[in-house]
Every structure is written in C-alpha cells, then in structure tokens.
Amino acid sequence: MTIKTLADGTSYTKAHAHDWEDPDCTIKGRVKIYRKIDGIRAIRNKIGDVWSRNSKPLPHCDHLNFQDAEIFRNSWNETSSILGRIDAPTVALTQENVYELRDGFIDPRLYIGWADNPSNENLEALMHKYIAQGDEGLIVRVEHKGKVLWWKIVPYKYADVIITGFKEGTNKNKGKCGSIASNWGSAGSMVEDCLQDHNIKGDANIRTWLWQNRNSLIGKVMQVRYREKTEAGKLRFPSLVRLRTDKNEESFD
C-alpha cells in the first residue's frame, strides 16, 4: 500500500499488487476481502472537483456523492468511454455506478468476507471466481501497525517487448527512470527482483540504474507482466519483470 497525492495535495491510498504466484509471499493476519471491480478511480480534490489519479479532471461526475470511489458502468470500456469524452452520455451516471473505497465508508456491495492468513491458493481460486463474474480481481485489506494495508489480487499475463525509450521521473524519482516505453505502452512500475541479474535491489536503486543505462538499453527486450490488452492493442498496467538479454524478438502470452 502506498499513500499517494494529487497535484493539490489531496491524499489517497493505492493498493500494491500481491505476488500470489510466489509461494514465499503471503498475506498474514485477519483480512477483509473485497471485489475489485474494473472501473475508473475518481477522487474529489480539496475544492470538491473530481480528478483522476493523474490529477486530470473527470467529467460527468459532479452530481454524484463520493469522496474516493470507483466509477463503473457495465464494463471498463464503457466507463472509460463516458469519462473520456466532453459531451455528456445519453444516460447520465447514477449513484448505482459509484463504489466508495475509503476505509470505514467502503461500499457494502464490494464486501466478500474475511479470512485468517489466507493462502495464495485460496486467494487465486477466489480471484478467478469473481473474474468469471466480470470483476477485475480482489482487494485484500489488513490492519498493520495502526494502518490498513491494501493488496490487490489480479491475474497476470506476460510479454517480451522491445524498449523504445525512457521517461525521466518526477518528484522523488527526478533524475531516475520514471517509465520505460514500448510500442505497446509504458511500464512505470518495476517488480522487486527485476534487476537481480545485476544485483540491483530497491525501487530507487533500480530506477537509478535504468536511467544511467538507458541509452544502451534502447532496442533491447524487456519482459513485462500486464493485465490484458486494450481494444487499441495496448497493455494495461505493464510492470518490468526483467531484462531479456537472451532475446531480440517480441512475444506475448
């Protein structure tokens, strides 16, 4: 879990992906399990305007009651289409399309149940059950040292893609790699052991190394994991898994 901020300083919680494929990586303690619906995150800033997590205005939501919510109507594509255009939809969004996410105020429609020390196998099975019903996966929330940690349980696909460029990070990542570009989208997050072949550990060190070596890496192949391909053929939420020095061709699951 990470506490992130919008451009005006409004804070919100971002869930971290739980690596349920790793048998050594488990979630401990009593947890509450929720549906992760495949919508668009919408957050009210300090003056009440509705922004995306990238601090971009989201239209057609001002009449809805929420502070930090997932907006969802029928599918991610339909929701994205509504919030991505200036002209109002034929049928306005309603409160039924709003799923509040704040701790203590979470929409009861999202709640599945609780568990003690859930196994990765059980989480995977539950994830696939709800994906079959149209959800994106699960969110597991667990109290830890007075805070509520958010873990997302989502499926992964893998692809080997050619690196086409690098973008410098901002704020704490200034002077480091912010994202790695490919023809299929940009990877802005890095798996913890993505540079284990180079004995580089820690997000800051990984981003520093990538930025320092960016010129020699352009044209090389990186392995990314992602959720799915969009209708435009882009990868949703790609993350760097490792550099593929043994390959020079692209491939997809």
Regions found by a protein language model. Name each.
Residues 25-107, 252:
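Covalent nucleotidyltransferase
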